[in-house]
Regions:
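Glycan-recognition and catalytic cores of secretory/periplasmic carbohydrate-active enzymes
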Residues: 1-190
Length: 190
């Protein structure tokens, strides 16, 4: 990669992108991270918190810590890991909840394999960056949950969404944002 481009990208990452989330999105009152900020920079402190956002924050700051070695990135990653395990992880049935309310209480308890996959990515990267055995243990647990509850041997594939107790959902409606994601990924060849 061109050295100038690499330096510009690293500067953008370390002076704008990573600090943005550290300064604006940490929920000091209820734990974890705020679930929403508008395009006009209006924070929505009572917005629901999603597993995917938390897991992406975990992966991002874990990777940033691994590559750049800054302690504040490790602290952000650890905050995301703790919140994922303490609030999103379903200690009774395994997997992670799709969403929590702003206070960190389960809201939508269905098991979305997409969200569990992101949790595995984040926890695995945290383990890679820090050697943390707890992160690895939960990543393996979540992987095993997918294999034991989502794999359909008859169809040789995986069920995307299940109830909290890992039962099939007969009819699943997607939100507008979920439909947009599905359209983007199917149209882009992902």
């Amino acid at each position: 990669m061109d050295e100038i481009l690499k330096q510009e990208m690293q500067k953008e990452l370390t002076t704008r992108i990573l600090p943005y989330w550290m300064e604006r999105m940490v929920d000091q009152e209820n734990g974890g991270f705020y679930g929403r900020i508008t395009g006009q920079e209006e924070l929505m402190p009572r917005a629901d918190k999603g597993a995917i956002l938390n897991a992406r924050i975990l992966w991002t700051y874990s990777a940033a810590y691994r590559l750049l070695g800054r302690e504040e990135y490790k602290e952000m990653a650890n905050r995301a890991k703790r919140y994922l395990i303490d609030h999103f992880y379903d200690s009774e049935f395994g997997g992670v909840y799709w969403s929590l309310n702003y206070r960190g209480e389960p809201l939508d308890t269905k098991k979305q394999i997409y969200a569990i996959g992101f949790a595995i990515y984040g926890l695995s990267e945290f383990h890679r960056a820090t050697g943390d055995p707890e992160a690895l243990m939960y990543a393996v647990r979540l992987f095993n949950d997918i294999e034991s509850h989502s794999f359909d041997g008859l169809k040789n594939g995986y069920c995307e969404a299940l109830t909290r107790e890992w039962n099939e959902i007969a009819f699943l409606l997607f939100s507008n944002s979920e439909v947009t994601s599905l359209i983007f990924f199917s149209d882009s060849g992902w």
